[in-house]
Amino acid sequence: MARRGRFALAPLAGFILVAPRIKVMYCPTTKVACSSLKLLLAKANGSYDAARVERLVGPHIARSQTIHERRVNGLPKLVDLPLREIQEVLASPEWLRVYATRDPLARAYSAWENRIFSRAPGTPDRAIELCPDELADGRVDVAASFARFARAIAEHTDAFMEDHHFLPQTHIVQPDRFDYTMRVRVEEPEEMARLVAEVNRRADTRLELERHNQGFGIPLAEVCDKHSANRLAATYAMDHERFGYPTRTFAAIVAPRPLGQVEASLLRSFRGAVEQLQAVSFSARSLAGVRFGARQIWKSLARHATLGRAYRDPAQVHW
């Protein structure tokens, strides 16, 4: 394992993954096609382990989200490599060093829809408290709820930045500190296609980019007015400036956008499923912890009783 103290950029490299077989370094950014790109790289690298999905106890809403588990994607973190390998990854012309970006406002909308509106697991409680549902005639008003979020993140930014889904993209990829060789914009199909082609060339595969984590399908223009857009543009000003995304023009006022009957039912079902999943996941993790602890106690007693002859294999001591 790399000693982080000897790797000067380690504090900035916590998100970066590597696909050693195809020599690709990738910095995933949440809500920027990261599920799709991780799956692509894991398959190309030959490290994707679908069999492990069934044994996970974490709260995953969809099977596609399990690709973020290291045990599933098999992609090591840059900071966990030996120092010599880190230096090669960061400097060798043989390595592709890539990151993806997305329009900051579109990304913020996607993050709100997933983390706040849908109550995705792991969302900070304080962020959800700051963004209660806004109602119109007794129905959830998506436009007013999104406006509430835009005000909240502008006024209480720190409460949201605990969740990396809301972090500015510049804070994650650190483009001024790492020598990336490719940047792709997810809005540009030809750029994404170029990345997929390069990965396939390196892996000698014919993989395609799969789409995951689709939202409710409500266009941003239906729920975002110019006031919300301005607040979010200010919050993510560094992304607009660094990545060259222009500010967009929105209507001064948007009409209420209450959820339809089917949409409201879907939202209730989704939130209910999240609550149940979190409860089941907590119970599963607790049970796994109890079983692990019991095994360790038994092994300790067995080793003591046999004067160290039992469970002598170091690889089995903590299994």
Name every feature range the model reports, one short phrase each.
Residues M1-W319:
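Membrane-interface amphipathic segments in extracytoplasmic regions
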